Structures are given as structure tokens and as C-alpha cells.
Amino acid sequence: KYKVALSGSGADEIFSGYYDHQLMYLYEVRNNKKLYQEHLNKWKKYILPNIRNKYFRNPHMFFHNKKERSYIYDHNKELKKFFLNPKKNIFKEKYFSSSLLKNRMLNEVFFENVPIFTHSEDLNFMQHSVENRSPFLNRKLFEFMQTVPPKFYMQKGFTKYILRKIIDKYVPDEIRLE
């Protein structure tokens, strides 16, 4: 019987792995023509064909308004009509950083994804008397990643580039580059 399980929670939020992160990354590197064009080309070739959400299909989503959040349901008139009791508290991001991408990631870590995921995981694992650990949420790792400039979060068209580089020697490419 298993006593401990390792979770991947926090990896996308700490290392930058979501679709909207890619669009914010393009915004972050917009003044570095080479880096911008390289990422945009890879994004169009490898990522865009897999995106079903119409809000994430525009690579310049944040160029006109860096506070754009129409993809979040309580800002979206189309989606609001499906709720019987729309939320009264409109989603507002807290300000942590002048970097659009870092600010988004920090909101996900402290208020959005991570608290919800870890709570659900803890309940599910406790149901089976298994201890859940989330190594990507290690405080020192988190603090280190806060010192890394956003331009290093993605490279060669890959999200979570730093994480992929770290595990290069230990994980086969067919898993690492998936």
C-alpha cells in the first residue's frame, strides 16, 4: 500500500505553463524582436492548432489592453448568461509585480488554482490515508523562480522551459518535451 504520493500541483503556476501565459509572454518580450518572432512562430506552428478556446487564439490579446480578462468567466458577457446566480464579487487580480506574466502567475499561486487544487488533492488523498506532497510548491523553489526574469520562462516554443531543462538528464524527451 502507498503511504505518500507526489503531485504536480504548482508546476504550471511556478514555471509558466498555461495558454494565457504564452500570450502574456509574447507581451513581455514584445520589444525583443528576435525572441518575440521566434516564440510567435513556434506558437503559431505548435500551439495555435491545439487551442479551442477562442480567447486564447489571439497572440496579441494583451497588446491592446494588458488588463484584458474576458477569458475569465465573470468578465465575460457570453458566459455570464449561463449562470443562474452570477457571482456578485467580480474577479480582481491583486498587484504583486509590474510584470504582467509574473503577476498572473502569483495570483494563480496565492488565490486561484493552487489553493483549489491542493485542497481537492488533500481531500482525495486523505480519503485513502495517503499523504500528498507537492514538491513544486517548495518555498525555496518558489522564491528562486521569483528571481528569474520572465524572458527565460519559455524558450524554443516550450512552456516551463526551466523545468524541462532541469529534468533533461533524468526524463526521456518523449515525456519531457510533451
Task: Give, region by region, the residue ranges found by the protein language model.
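ATP-dependent adenylate-handling active sites, centered on carboxylate activation for C-N bond formation
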Residues: 1-90, 123-170
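Residue-level recognition of hydrophobic positions within alpha-helical transmembrane segments
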Residues: 9, 104, 117-118, 134
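Structural motif
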Residues: 95-109
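Short, flexible segments with low predicted structural confidence
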Residues: 96-98, 112-117, 139
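Short Ser/Thr-interspersed hydrophobic loop/turn segments at strand-loop and sheet-helix junctions
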Residues: 109-123, 145
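PAPS-dependent sulfotransferase catalytic core
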Residues: 171-178
